[in-house]
């Protein structure tokens, strides 16, 4: 099992865990380039704004953490492997019970159709994963996360490793040294997530 104190210490040092889908062993990752979101310059897409105005989705915070992390761990259309092992689910569920890990959930007609989860430390939020069972469900949840972080005064939204989906949402890559500088600054802030 991943020890909670070890997990939190790793985040403060710029590491995050990933499980190997073949052996489920947990590895500590610290990529040379880090994907982050500039909270001040984030702008939702027109489609997200349209769906938000239409109130097609209902978004909640910390209502269904277990459903979100299991949705993130489930196989996807183009990728049947997952880095989210049972050990990782157990650790983040414990962090959630301690008020450190949080989820945003997107609901459509009463059904959980998307969401994301991550952990909050100081003025940093570490986005772990997102999932969507209906078009735009994870983007709507992400939009709510960004506005929540802005409202609370967060400085850093860490998305870890760049991928095409994060790039479409507006993530940028920064060098390791710059990431560590931003992380150190963000961790000095005292912010209550809820």
Swiss-Prot record:
The keyword Hydrolase does not apply. Pfam families: Leu_Phe_trans. Its EC number is 2.3.2.6. GO terms for cellular component: cytoplasm. InterPro entries: Acyl_CoA_acyltransferase, Leu/Phe-tRNA_Trfase, Leu/Phe-tRNA_Trfase_C. It is found in: Cytoplasm. Its main location: cytoplasm. Keywords: Acyltransferase, Cytoplasm, Transferase. It catalyses: N-terminal L-lysyl-[protein] + L-leucyl-tRNA(Leu) = N-terminal L-leucyl-L-lysyl-[protein] + tRNA(Leu) + H(+); N-terminal L-arginyl-[protein] + L-leucyl-tRNA(Leu) = N-terminal L-leucyl-L-arginyl-[protein] + tRNA(Leu) + H(+); L-phenylalanyl-tRNA(Phe) + an N-terminal L-alpha-aminoacyl-[protein] = an N-terminal L-phenylalanyl-L-alpha-aminoacyl-[protein] + tRNA(Phe). One of its GO terms (molecular function) is leucyl-tRNA--protein transferase activity. One of its GO terms (biological process) is protein catabolic process. It comes from the Bacteria. Gene3D superfamilies: Leucyl/phenylalanyl-tRNA-protein transferase, C-terminal domain. Functions in the N-end rule pathway of protein degradation where it conjugates Leu, Phe and, less efficiently, Met from aminoacyl-tRNAs to the N-termini of proteins containing an N-terminal arginine or lysine. Belongs to the L/F-transferase family. This is Leucyl/phenylalanyl-tRNA--protein transferase. It comes from Pelodictyon phaeoclathratiforme (strain DSM 5477 / BU-1). The lineage of its organism: Bacteria, Pseudomonadati, Chlorobiota, Chlorobiia, Chlorobiales.
């Amino acid at each position: 099992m991943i020890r909670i104190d070890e997990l939190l210490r790793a985040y403060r040092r710029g590491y995050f865990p990933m499980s190997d889908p073949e052996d489920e062993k947990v590895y500590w990752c610290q990529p040379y380039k880090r994907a982050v979101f500039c909270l001040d310059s984030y702008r939702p897409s027109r489609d997200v704004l349209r769906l938000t105005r239409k109130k097609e989705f209902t978004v909640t915070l910390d209502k269904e953490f277990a459903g979100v992390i299991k949705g993130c761990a489930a196989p996807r259309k183009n990728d049947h492997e997952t880095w989210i092992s049972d050990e990782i689910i157990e650790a983040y569920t414990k962090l959630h019970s301690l008020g450190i890990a949080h989820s945003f959930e997107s609901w459509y007609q009463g059904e959980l159709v998307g969401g994301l989860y991550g952990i909050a430390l100081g003025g940093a939020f570490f986005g772990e994963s997102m999932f969507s069972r209906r078009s735009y469900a994870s983007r709507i949840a992400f939009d709510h996360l960004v506005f929540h972080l802005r409202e609370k005064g967060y400085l850093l939204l860490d998305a870890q490793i760049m991928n095409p989906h994060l790039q479409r949402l507006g993530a940028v890559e920064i060098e390791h040294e710059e990431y560590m500088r931003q992380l150190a600054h963000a961790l000095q802030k005292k912010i209550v997530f809820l």
